[in-house]
Structures are given as structure tokens and as C-alpha cells.
Amino acid sequence: MIAGLDVRTTDVSEVTAAAGLVFENPFSQITGSRFTVYEEIAFGLENMGLPRDEIIKRIEESLDLLDIRKVKDKNPFDLSGGQMQRVAIAGVVAMKPKVLILDEPTSQLDPQGSDEVFKVVENLTKEGITIIMAEQKMEKIAQYADRVLLLDDAKLIAYDTPEAIFSREDLASLGVQPPAVTAIARHLNKRKANGHYPVELDELKGLLAEEGVPHE
């Protein structure tokens, strides 16, 4: 089920209208048939047959939401990796999907580009868009995710909060490395009141401060 649609029985056009996909490599997403970022975002909207006024409105909204207005007249292939990935996301977001699926969108980006993309994801969730992301950067998952799907060999192992997932005792056997903060908390046996290990630094500092342990 995606956005209330049974993908086994629903027409593909309906499913693709409800769910947008952003690939791991932005070079695979950018069409290359347009010369500017503005035109690239317009490409999908034009194929949808939307009125000109609606196309312009959606492009303007996407430029602001993805914070790429300053590069709207540049060629997408002249941008940094983080900027190019934001353009790829903008092109999909402009089509107003209910669900946005991101396939390891930061795997080929440097730390700055990765931070840019995660900030964008945070803004999109505030706009009411459901985000499903395949990602291996555990610190980022701990910081930004509301819920985590833990898979092993394509089988669902657990679906819970980042705290609950990273507090599991079987992570090593599943090949999952918890965030550094959680690993330290486990080593020190510092748990929160709910029995879970903290996943963010400020939480661990708070636990240490409660016991008067120096932590600066």
C-alpha cells in the first residue's frame, strides 16, 4: 500500500502520481534535456500537461522549499553534488506526491552535501510530505527519522523509533552499527528512563550530568 493505494491492483499512473522517487545518483535523475535548473524542474510538470500558471507556481514553490533559487539559471551539471541532489528532489516535489521515496540520497555526497539534503528532508516533512528513505548513515537516521524499518535479507525485523531500534541487542549479528553516541552509552550502561540508550549527544550529556559525571 502506498498513500492508500494497493500497488498490485492500481494503475501505474495513479501510483506514480502518489509516490515520487529520487535516485541515489542525481546524475541519473537529471534529464539533461534542459539548460537551467528552472527548466529542469519544469520538465516533469510540462509532461503532466498542467496549465502554465500552475507550472510557474509549483516551480517557484520548489525553488524556495529546496533553497535553490540562487542557482535557478545555472546548468544543473555545473552544480555541487548537494545542489544537484536538491534539484533532483525539487523536480519530484514539484509534482506534489503524497509520498517521497529517497534511495540513499547522500551516499555519493560529501558531509556538507549530505547535511544540505537532510535539512531539505526535514523541511519537506514539515510540509506534510511522507518521506521513506533508504539510508546507511546511522547518525543521520537517529537525528532525523521518526521511525526506522530494520531489514535483514529483505525480511522485516523491526519497525520502531530510532531509540528502540539502536538499543536492540542483536544489531551486531544483523550487521548494523549504531550511532557513536549510542555505542558509548551502551559501553557505559547509561539508559534513559524508558530503558533505551540515547541516540543523540545532548541526551547522553544529560544522563551523565544527572550523575555528576564530567562530560565536556
Regions found by a protein language model. Name each.
Residues 135-136:
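H-loop/switch region of ABC-family ATPase nucleotide-binding domains
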Residues 100-103:
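Catalytic Walker B motif of ABC-type/P-loop ATPase nucleotide-binding domains
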Residues 1-14:
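ABC ATPase NBD Q-loop/coupling interface
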Residues 153-154:
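Conserved ABC ATPase "signature" C-loop
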